[in-house]
Amino acid sequence: GAFDTTNLETNRVHSTIPDAMYDARETFGIDIDLKVPGFAHDLPNVPEIDDTYQFDHDTTLAVLAGFAHNRRVMVQGLHGTGKSTHIEQIAARLKWPCIRINLDSHVSRIDLLGKDLIVLKEGKQITEWKDGILTWALQNPVALVFDEYDAGRPDVMFVIQRILEAEGKLTLLDQNKIIRPHPAFRLFATANTIGLGDTTGLYHGTQQINQGQMDRWNIVTVLNYLSVEDETKIILAKIPELNNAESKDEVASMVQLANLTRQGFRSGDLSTLMSPRTVLSWA
C-alpha cells in the first residue's frame, strides 16, 4: 500500500549531525582505509543490524561516498540482488536513520509532499499542514531510499527531480515556504534497470528514466549476484546447523541451481528467478 507516515517517529525534529567516525575495514569488512561519519547513538528509524550480512566491495564504497560526501547514489541490479538491504545494512552500522519508499506502489505526490488536514482544536475545525514523507525526511538526519526508482509515476518523478536539481531545496508553493535539506539528509535510489528502460520485457511497468534524471545522480553502481561460494557462506552463517560436510554440499547445489535460474532470467528464457531470499527459505 501507500507509504504510511504515521508510524514514523516524526514528533521530534532531531538537531543532530553525525558525531562519530567509523572505520570502513572494521565496520564493513572491506579492504580499504576509509573513515566514514555516522552517529554514536541509536536514533529512531535506524535499521536493525544483520550480523551475517556480506558487503559487496564496490557497492559499499559507492554508498559510503554517499553518506560521507552527501552524494546522490543509485544502486542498480537485477531483482533479488539485495540492493535496498545493502543500503539499509550500511545505514544500520553507521546508526543513520534510514527510510525506504517503494515507488512502484501507489505513492502519490501528496504522500511525498504533504497535505492540509482538518483538525479539531479547542472545539473549532481548523486546517493544519501535515508533512509528507519527503518533506519530513528532508528536514531530518535521514537516508531516504527510493526503491524501484525506474517504476515511479511521472508526477512523483517530477517532485523528485525538483530536489535533485536545486541543491536539494524544495519549494512548497501552497505553503509558501522553501525547505532546505538537513545537513545529514541523504538520498539513495535502487533500480532494476540502468535507466535504459527494460529491453528484455521482464520488468513490467518500468519507465525509461530520462537522461536529465540520470545525470543528476552523482554515482550509479551495479550490484550483481554473489558468487556461489559467497552465497553458500551467507546461508551457512544464517542457518549454522547446516554447516557440516553433508549439508554444505547440498546448500552449494541449491545455490548453483538458483544461479542457473538467474542466468535463464537474464537471457530471457525464464520469467522468474530464485533470489538469495528464496534459497534461504528453501534451505
Where do the protein language model's features map onto the residues?
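C-terminal helical "lid" subdomain and adjoining coupling/linker elements of P-loop NTPases
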Residues: 261-283
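Residue-level recognition of alpha-helical structural elements
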Residues: 247-250, 272
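AAA+ P-loop NTPase catalytic core and its hallmark functional loops
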Residues: 1-248, 256
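Amphipathic alpha-helical interaction segments
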Residues: 62, 253-256, 274-281
